[in-house]
Amino acid sequence: KGFTLVELIVVLVIIAILAAMLIPALTGYIDKAKNKSIIAETRSAVMAAQTLIDEEYGKTNVGKLEETEIPVEDIAELAEVDPDKISNFALNTEGTKVATLTYTDGKKVCTYNPDNKSSNSDGAYDVSKEE
């Protein structure tokens, strides 16, 4: 009236095979989600930096700004991230836009570069493993 031991073992083997096929696919989705997460954090830092650049330019309106006029600590505070995670912040030659910004979360590095043409990037955001 119940299942035999052989039938239960067959069911368990089938479940194990299905799980073995799904785990690599799920791992890929997890990696993509982690990449999207660091891109979102980097985008937040870039938007904060651009906001501060626009505010500073509006105050002075004297032309070119320098990176030193926009402290990384202010960018991190506005983006609500740790200032130690932001590096390589630079303005474009006109001093009016973010040219580059690198964000590190401890495992991966995301670099913002609007001129990026890399095929493995998400537009202006390039994610790589931390060295």
Model-derived segments and their meaning:
Residues 123-125:
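C-terminal partner/receptor-binding element of secreted or periplasmic proteins
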Residues 26-46:
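Aliphatic-rich helix starts adjacent to a transmembrane/signal segment
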